[in-house]
């Protein structure tokens, strides 16, 4: 049995359209069910984030993403930023769900909020390329508007550094995945997230104001 049954139950609805039950006609009951699933999954994710944040009390929790977007499209891949020191415009940590109901997990990343960015956010973020990287940490880079995964190798670090200098890469995140669908215990998940944090702290520090 999954440790995160609400998330597992909600993931198959990725991309579905939600209609307000009062306007859904014959779909009223199914919309009420979707809303309940979304709210339960969001709470389950938020509770995990709170447990993680309690291990790092100096991090400030931002708000968990909603279970649907403004266009009322269901959005099960929740995320939650955790602000360290500095301004809200600067890179920080974030936890983000990924995967399908059959194989899902949470990634810890160093990134910034696009809606809060200023003229320095990108240059600070891309300092993550200044440090050597080691798997299982990896890069998630935005090239021509498309985000792509790059394994954590020196070869990829050099490649992305060159692409950044050439203006081909806009933004580079550093991420570390922790599986949830097959996790044996919550303690195991939190322990693996602590390993992820240990791996990513140097990259976070690299983004700080020099």
Can you say where each PLM-predicted feature lies in the sequence?
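Sparse, context-dependent recognition of short Cys/His-centered cofactor- or disulfide-binding micro-motifs
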Residues: 63-67, 78-82, 91, 157-163
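Short charge-dense sequence patches
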Residues: 1, 70-79, 143-155
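Long, solvent-exposed, polar/charged low-complexity segments
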Residues: 1-56, 149-210
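Short, surface-exposed, charge-dense and proline/glycine-enriched linear segments
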Residues: 62, 85-99, 137-143, 169-174
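Aromatic- and glycine-enriched beta-alpha-beta binding-site module
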Residues: 70-132
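Short N-terminal edge-element motif at the start of the domain
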Residues: 46-76
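Compact, glycine/acidic-enriched structural inserts
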Residues: 36, 104-161
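Generic structural hydrophobic/aromatic packing signal, biased to beta-strands
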Residues: 80-82, 106-108, 139-140, 172-176, ...
């Amino acid at each position: 049995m999954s440790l995160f049954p609400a998330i597992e139950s909600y993931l198959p609805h990725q991309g579905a359209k939600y209609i307000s039950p009062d306007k859904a006609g014959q779909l009223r009951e199914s919309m009420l069910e979707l809303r309940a699933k979304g709210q339960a999954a969001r709470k389950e994710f938020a509770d995990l984030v709170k447990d993680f944040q309690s291990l790092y009390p100096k991090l400030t929790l931002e708000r968990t993403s909603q279970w649907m977007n403004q266009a009322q499209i269901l959005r099960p891949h929740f995320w939650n930023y955790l602000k360290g020191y500095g301004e809200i415009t600067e890179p920080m940590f974030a936890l983000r769900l990924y995967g399908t109901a059959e194989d899902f997990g949470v990634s810890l990343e160093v990134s910034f909020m696009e809606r809060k960015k200023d003229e320095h956010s990108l240059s600070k973020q891309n300092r993550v390329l200044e440090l050597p990287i080691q798997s299982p940490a990896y890069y998630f880079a935005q090239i021509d508007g498309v985000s792509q995964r790059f394994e954590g190798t020196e070869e990829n670090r050099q490649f992305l550094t060159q692409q950044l200098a050439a203006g081909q890469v806009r933004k580079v995140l550093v991420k570390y995945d922790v599986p949830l669908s097959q996790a044996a215990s919550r303690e195991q998940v939190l322990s693996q997230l602590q390993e992820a944090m240990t791996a990513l702290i140097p990259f976070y520090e690299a983004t700080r104001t020099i």
